[in-house]
Design a protein with these regions (language model features):
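Residue-level marker for buried hydrophobic side chains located in beta-strands
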Residues: 7, 95, 160, 207, ...
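Active-site phosphate-binding/coordination module
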Residues: 66-126
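Short coil/turn connectors at secondary-structure junctions
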Residues: 2-4, 90-91, 137-140, 184-186, ...
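Short beta-strand segments
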Residues: 10, 74-77, 144-146, 207-208, ...
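Catalytic phosphate/nucleotide-handling subdomain of diverse soluble enzymes
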Residues: 209-240
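Gly/Ser/Thr-rich active-site cleft segment
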Residues: 11-13, 85, 113-211
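Short acidic-glycine loop/turn motifs at beta-strand connectors
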Residues: 22-25, 85-89, 153-156, 173, ...
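N-terminal glycine/serine-rich phosphate-binding loop of ATP-dependent small-molecule kinases
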Residues: 1-91, 202-206
């Protein structure tokens, strides 16, 4: 029997958890976790984390995946956070705990977000970006945490719809982009969990949103089923 080690990564808000799984044996061969970096800025409104610290951890973890001879990697990441890349330089990671968003901004007041898959709140990336100057956004590229990890590993700003739609920039049914900001570059979005590239011989699959994955893993398939997910933040949700 040929063993095919699969690497599973969950980038949470308190811990980053990872494991090596062997499907034919249905066995966990290795697992570990590291704390998610502490914020550089946490003043009650702004919550920013060093991009460099996140990058170092991701590369260190995937070096472990390579050492464990993993053939493929599946990733889920905390939703609603983002990074901006301007002039080839990344800014800090703006966490979902950040509350700088301008929900009353004129761009958002006449838009029906019912098909975006998210509600616009002060911690929403879309509302947060309304506080930036247009000239800055016109020179920037937007990344979810998931698409940022894709970029580190494959050079592509790409992610799965369960991660991308939490930003508020995409219609969750059609994946159509909402063009709120001129020239702001957005991630490419995949409808299916597909391989997007390789890192050190490992097939990297499009990252997914962690809350969406918790629902999938629960096995709840009926529309009248509710899921209580207790993590760093707690959510209660049902299928639409």
């Amino acid at each position: 029997m040929i063993k095919v080690n699969v690497f599973l990564l969950d980038v949470g808000s308190t811990f980053i958890k990872y494991m090596v799984y062997e499907p034919s044996l249905k066995a966990e061969l290795f697992s570990d976790s590291v704390p998610f970096p502490m914020p550089l800025i946490n003043d009650g409104v702004h919550y920013e984390i060093s991009e460099e610290e996140i990058r170092k951890i991701i590369y260190r973890i995937f070096n472990t995946a390579s050492e464990k001879e993993c053939k493929s990697a599946f990733i889920c990441a905390q939703m609603h956070g983002y990074l901006l890349r301007r002039h080839n330089t990344f800014g800090n990671y703006i966490s979902w705990r950040d509350n700088r968003g301008d929900t009353s901004n004129y761009r958002l007041t006449n838009v029906d977000f019912s098909e975006s898959g998210t509600a616009i709140k002060k911690n929403s990336p879309l509302a947060s970006l309304c506080t930036y100057e247009e000239s800055i956004l016109a020179e920037s590229e937007f990344f979810t945490l998931g698409s940022y990890i894709s970029f580190l590993l494959t050079g592509k700003n790409i992610t799965h719809k369960t991660d991308a739609c939490a930003s508020g920039f995409f219609n969750s049914c059609t994946l159509e982009k909402y063009d709120f900001f001129d020239n702001l570059v957005l991630p490419s979005v995949l409808d299916k969990v597909e391989m997007i590239g390789k890192y050190r011989g490992i097939d990297i699959y499009a990252p997914m949103g962690d809350h969406q994955i918790s629902f999938l893993g629960s096995g709840a398939e009926k529309k009248n089923a509710y899921l209580l997910n207790i993590g760093t933040a707690t959510q209660i949700s049902t299928l639409a």
